[in-house]
């Protein structure tokens, strides 16, 4: 079973659009253990400690459907999973190279703030799939 207490989202910058913040807060109420860390930079050395998994979001990344994403996250067993979301310029090629996985949410391009909301919804969906809850309909 996938649990939100093993998942952290690291994002560059703060959410400025209130409607995106409201959407994120709705999912945070459902997953209060999920950590969202807003900062100015990523410290990969700290994120890499204890053999944590680093998943970087980028439009050039690998795409999964929701069930595949759930399976991927479940395969990481008891490891802590850190998602990295860049700012308007994305993330550097150095961070992409050092990540365990570069993930794309869609072939479409999204503003970085909206990508956070979409990622959080997909995390909630993956947890729901792993718990056999009715949220996800195949």
UniProtKB/Swiss-Prot annotation:
Binding site for S-adenosyl-L-methionine: 57, 86, 105-110
Enzyme class, UniProt record, top EC level: transferase
GO cellular component entries: cytoplasm
Primary subcellular site in the record, as a coarse category: cytoplasm
Coiled coil: none
Superkingdom field: Bacteria
SUPFAM superfamilies cross-referenced by the UniProt entry: alpha/beta knot
GO molecular function, one term: rRNA (pseudouridine-N3-)-methyltransferase activity
Record's catalysed reaction(s): pseudouridine(1915) in 23S rRNA + S-adenosyl-L-methionine = N(3)-methylpseudouridine(1915) in 23S rRNA + S-adenosyl-L-homocysteine + H(+)
InterPro entries reported in the protein's UniProt record: Alpha/beta_knot_MTases (IPR029028), RlmH-like (IPR003742), tRNA_m1G_MTases_N (IPR029026)
Enzyme Commission number(s) from the entry: 2.1.1.177
Protein's cellular compartments: Cytoplasm
Alphabetic keyword roster: Cytoplasm, Methyltransferase, rRNA processing, S-adenosyl-L-methionine, Transferase
Family to which the UniProt record says this protein belongs: Belongs to the RNA methyltransferase RlmH family.
Quaternary structure and partners: Homodimer.
Task performed by this protein: Specifically methylates the pseudouridine at position 1915 (m3Psi1915) in 23S rRNA.
PANTHER family: METHYLTRANSFERASE (PTHR33603), RIBOSOMAL RNA LARGE SUBUNIT METHYLTRANSFERASE H (PTHR33603:SF1)
Protein name, as recorded: Ribosomal RNA large subunit methyltransferase H
Species per Swiss-Prot/TrEMBL record: Prochlorococcus marinus (strain AS9601)
High-level lineage: Bacteria, Bacillati, Cyanobacteriota, Cyanophyceae, Synechococcales
Gene, per the UniProt record: rlmH
């Amino acid at each position: 079973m996938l649990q939100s207490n093993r998942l952290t989202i690291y994002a560059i910058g703060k959410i400025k659009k209130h409607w995106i913040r409201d959407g994120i807060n709705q999912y945070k109420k459902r997953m209060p253990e999920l950590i969202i860390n807003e900062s100015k930079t990523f410290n990969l050395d700290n994120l890499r400690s204890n053999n944590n998994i680093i998943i970087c979001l980028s439009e050039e990344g690998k795409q999964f459907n929701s069930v595949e994403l759930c399976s991927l996250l479940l395969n990481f067993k008891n490891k802590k999973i850190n998602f990295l979301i860049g700012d308007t310029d994305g993330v550097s090629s150095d961070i992409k190279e050092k990540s365990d996985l570069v993930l794309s949410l869609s072939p479409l391009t999204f503003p970085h703030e909206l990508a956070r909301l979409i990622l959080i919804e997909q995390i909630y969906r993956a947890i729901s799939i792993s718990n056999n809850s009715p949220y996800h309909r195949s």
